[in-house]
């Protein structure tokens, strides 16, 4: 069995080597000819799986994407061709939520504005948005939720309409899929009219899809003097992003919000488990076998622990400003995709075990840290 996997997917050999021969490919350079005699295709979001790509896929029986979103996959085409498909729902939800939390604490420190005095609006309450909401609510922060699809399905009673949420929030973070048309279209949901109407001092965070915000309109609004704090991990037209926008962004990164070691490896594991299920193979391998011990594993709290100390713990594991520095310094020389490919190892909050008798331990556990018994 021949297995073709994106070069940036971790642990594919460890999970799939007993099943077949694993070959790697560049996610943006994959061609139809490379799929000749391939049985399994494992991708990420940079690869468009469409009729053109599958033109010579004579043996393909399974396509898996190690991502939550599936807007890069023609799922109807796969169904028509009787090719099994799986995404990896929830694989990087924790990672993206932690990216946002790191950004929130960094902004709070730099702007001298405590988080408990601010209202945070979350647009999109799927696996990532709901994960983030749970963590923020554990810290007793004020959170507003907007998800018209879930609301229509009766799954979100506390839904706040987008324009109302934008008006009432101090920070707005987007976690929606890219929907290009229809009633719930998210393509350019933040268009020039909405961007111009934003209240001064608002923080916008986008770690979903770059096309959710009209980047050219955002640049024009910022050039006209808009008072907005921007945290952008995703961009229109990646990897050829709008360079002029960078100087207006507080924290900028290269679509890596979900790129913890655990998050990426979890995506591979989910696809391995799904493939084994479809093929009737026993799934014997688990993530714990492969993850290395992190550099820092324990911390002890004192009684005087406060919000500033939570920020220090968060940034001990991951500080978004590190990635902002990498992008600004290296984009011109190395390019967007090279920075993604060579992204430094990043771990999740759960790798740090916290002990002590602080009253904050329960909140830290909800935030994702491991708390010693």
UniProtKB/Swiss-Prot annotation:
One of its GO terms (biological process) is pyridoxine biosynthetic process. Its EC number is 1.1.1.290. The keyword Coiled coil does not apply. It is found in: Cytoplasm. Its main location: cytoplasm. CDD domains: ErythrP_dh. Pfam families: 2-Hacid_dh (PF00389), 2-Hacid_dh_C (PF02826), DUF3410 (PF11890). Coiled coil: none annotated. GO terms for cellular component: cytosol. PROSITE patterns: D_2_HYDROXYACID_DH_1. It comes from the Bacteria. NAD(+) binds at residues 147, 207-209, 233, 258. The active site is at residues 209, 238, 255. PANTHER family: FORMATE DEHYDROGENASE 1 (PTHR42938:SF9). Homodimer. HAMAP family: PdxB. This is Erythronate-4-phosphate dehydrogenase. The gene is pdxB.
């Amino acid at each position: 069995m021949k297995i073709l996997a994106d070069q940036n997917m971790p642990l594919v050999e460890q999970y799939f080597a007993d099943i077949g021969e694993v070959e790697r490919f560049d996610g943006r350079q994959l061609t139809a000819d490379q799929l000749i005699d391939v049985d399994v295709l494992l991708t990420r979001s940079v690869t468009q799986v469409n009729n053109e790509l599958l033109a010579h896929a004579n043996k393909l029986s399974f396509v898996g994407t190690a991502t939550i979103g599936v807007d890069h996959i023609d799922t109807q085409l796969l169904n028509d061709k009787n090719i099994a498909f799986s995404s990896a729902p929830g694989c990087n939800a924790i990672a993206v939520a932690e990216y946002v939390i790191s950004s929130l604490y960094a902004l709070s420190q730099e702007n001298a504005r405590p988080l408990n005095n601010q209202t945070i609006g979350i647009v999109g309450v799927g696996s990532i948005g709901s994960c983030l909401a749970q963590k923020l609510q554990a810290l007793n922060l004020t959170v507003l939720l907007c998800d018209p699809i879930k609301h229509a399905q009766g799954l979100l009673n506390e839904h706040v309409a987008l324009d109302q949420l934008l008006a009432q929030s101090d920070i707005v973070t987007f976690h929606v899929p890219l929907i290009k048309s229809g009633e719930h279209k998210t393509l350019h949901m933040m268009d020039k009219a909405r961007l111009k109407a934003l209240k001064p001092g608002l923080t916008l965070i986008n770690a979903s899809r770059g096309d959710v915000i009209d980047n050219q309109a955002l640049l024009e609004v910022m050039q006209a003097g808009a008072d907005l704090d921007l945290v952008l991990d995703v961009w229109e037209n990646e990897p050829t992003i709008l360079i002029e926008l960078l100087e207006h962004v507080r924290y900028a990164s290269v679509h890596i919000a979900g790129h913890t070691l655990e998050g990426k490896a979890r995506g591979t594991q989910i696809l391995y488990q799904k493939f084994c299920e479809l093929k009737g193979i026993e799934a014997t391998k688990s993530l714990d076998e492969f993850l290395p011990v992190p550099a820092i594993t324990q911390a002890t709290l004192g009684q005087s622990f406060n919000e500033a100390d939570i920020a220090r713990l968060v940034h001990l594991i991951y500080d978004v400003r590190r990635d902002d520095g990498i992008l600004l310094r290296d984009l011109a020389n190395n390019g967007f995709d090279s920075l993604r490919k060579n992204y430094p190892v990043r771990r999740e909050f759960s790798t740090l075990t916290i002990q002590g008798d602080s009253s904050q331990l329960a909140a830290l556990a909800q935030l994702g840290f491991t708390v010693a018994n």
